[in-house]
């Protein structure tokens, strides 16, 4: 069996977000740079914005002509 095939394990790897140390984890890299983590993500901080998707659905229905309830197959019967 080949020896030394596993990467080096860093049990105290630093997770850095915006130049600030946010936590330590175990990793195969000594430093991990992230843009978003649970401390600044809107879902976890309670600053989540609700997105109005009704306009998107209406646009989809118009685009594929699914907006009307009566279909041609139903009229032919």
Swiss-Prot record:
One GO cellular component, as annotated: ribonucleoprotein complex
Annotated Gene3D superfamilies: Ribosomal protein L31
Pfam families: Ribosomal_L31
Gene Ontology terms describing biological process: translation
Gene Ontology molecular function: any one: rRNA binding
PROSITE patterns: RIBOSOMAL_L31
Keyword rRNA-binding: yes
Record key words, sorted: Ribonucleoprotein, Ribosomal protein, RNA-binding, rRNA-binding
Keyword flag Ribosomal protein: yes
Family of the protein in this entry: Belongs to the bacterial ribosomal protein bL31 family. Type A subfamily.
Database matches in PANTHER family: 50S RIBOSOMAL PROTEIN L31, CHLOROPLASTIC, LARGE RIBOSOMAL SUBUNIT PROTEIN BL31C
NCBIfam families with a match to the protein in the record: L31, PRK00528.1
Assembly description: Part of the 50S ribosomal subunit.
Protein name (Swiss-Prot/TrEMBL): Large ribosomal subunit protein bL31
Organism: Microcystis aeruginosa (strain NIES-843 / IAM M-2473)
Gene: rpmE
